[in-house]
Amino acid sequence: MGIQPTELSSQDIADEPTLVKQEIAGRSPMQIALTRLRNDKIAMICLFTVLLFVLIAIFAPLLTQMFGVELDGGDPSDDLDQFNFPLIGPPDHGFSWDAPLGISPNEADDNLAQWLYGARTSLSIATVSTLAATLIGVTIGLVAGFSHGWLDKVINFVIDVFLSLPFLLVALALAPIIVSRFGNSPEQLRFWQFTSLLIVLSLFGWMTLARLVRGEVLSLREREFIQAARVIGVPTRRILFKELLPNLMAPIIVSISLGLPAFVTAEAGFAYLGIGVVGVPSWGQTIDKAVPYFNTYPLFLYAPVAGVFLLVVALNLLGDAVRDAFDPKTRR
């Protein structure tokens, strides 16, 4: 019995399953990292918390109006008793919409208004300092990693010198000198107090990133695309900022996410030690004022400490998540 050939009708052919060719879309390392980050629930919670603090800092004037509180102090003769303790608001006199977080002893300032504007001061100083330190560190790291010979050695020596200096002692000595030298008038005093704090934080915040960028550049400069760019005569500046810098975005983003909480903590600590903008509310200055009243009026201290704690924890956890997203090998 032989094999009979079969004929397929057009209908049979139409019924055959067809293979649909689907294009395989490639994803960049940045897209892969963002996908990992979106799937991390803790990272999303921390990101929401950080964004909430940012919105509070931006809209602090509107929020004070919405709650009906004022930044300027109240009347101590009406709102404080004979011992300069509050007569309204929690924790001793119950909740009041006139002072949801109570008022401060001795000055009768509204604690909620001070907290809202303190978030603005702390976040603005930390953000500007982080950006300035990142700019300095990336630039110096690029130059040190791409150069050869004496320039690389000089830059490494400068980095070692800065790392060997005691940060706190130098900051306590340098900031008052800058303020006393340039803050001659009351109008200039506040500006130079703000500037001196930025200078101190930025001056000692770039070294770690510079070394990180230098190490990455030492590896990248031997790659084929960099060698090809040098052979065809591409200018050095274009190689640094158009070829190398885009390949360094991952470690730079990780460094920013981990450096920002450190600057928030440093700003609060320096304000507590007297280095800050006098007359402008900040969490550190509020903590400085509240420490003597810890036993008798603890709410005055709890509010700014809680703000610093929540923001720093959220930023640290978000920074860890960003690092794990860009480098899964570091995941715990």
Predicted features by range, described:
Residues 50, 114, 156, 172, ...:
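Residue-level recognition of transmembrane alpha-helices
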Residues 175-178, 265-307:
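Glycine-rich helix-loop "coupling/hinge" segments at transmembrane-helix boundaries
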Residues 53, 142, 172-176, 201, ...:
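Transmembrane alpha-helix boundary and packing residues in multipass membrane permease domains
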Residues 59-84, 170-172, 176-186, 271-273, ...:
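Extracellular/periplasmic helix-loop junction at the C-terminal end of a transmembrane helix
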